[in-house]
Amino acid sequence: MNKAKFITLDNGLTILIYTDKSKSTNHVELYTFFGGNHYEYVDCNGNTKKIKPGTAHLLEHYVFENTIDGNLFDNLKKYNILNCNGGTNTDNTSYFFNTVINFYECLEIFLRGIYNVSFSKDKLDKTKMAVYSEIRDDKENVRNNIIYRKLNNLFTINRKTLGSSS
């Protein structure tokens, strides 16, 4: 029988634990409710700050590639994960991994990485180049651009989560 339960930590983080006995894999996904449609945030002093479009997408890459222990994907690969990635949507950013073995070791590395990021200007510049490359590739994808233009005509909220190259 499948079971789901929510746990709320002292810091307010809510965790959903869902057990599905029909699966042989373990899936962990962490969501932050900060995505491509967010252009401001509230700092620890309660002040609202403006940010550039694409910031959530840039942070998605930055966090994944620059933990205090290095690249999160590379660190998890050592434990034979099935896959690992991050993604930015309009309303949220998520990070995940799937594994069959070494679940607790992978979970520890994953959480340590996500919550312990190493910031520097050089790392930020390198990450920006990767994001610019992704934006350029997206602009050159004719099929996606046709779909995006069609969706633009159907919906009023039509911002890309990738951001721009500016």
Regions found by a protein language model. Name each.
Residues N83-N89, F103, F119-D125, V142-I146:
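Short, flexible active-site-proximal loops enriched in glycine and acidic residues
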Residues S94, N98, S133, D138:
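Internal, well-ordered alpha/beta segment that forms a basic, Gly-enriched binding/recognition surface
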Residues Y62-T67, G113, D138-S166:
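Scaffold signal of the M16-like zinc-metallopeptidase fold and its non-catalytic homologs
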Residues I15-Y18, L82-N85, K150:
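Short beta-strand/turn micro-motifs at beta-sheet edges
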Residues H27-I109, R159-S165:
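M16/MPP (pitrilysin/insulinase) zinc-metallopeptidase core fold and M16-derived inactive scaffolds
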Residues M1-N26:
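N- or domain-start disorder-to-order transition segments that initiate the globular core
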Residues V117-R136:
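Acidic/histidine-enriched alpha-helical segments
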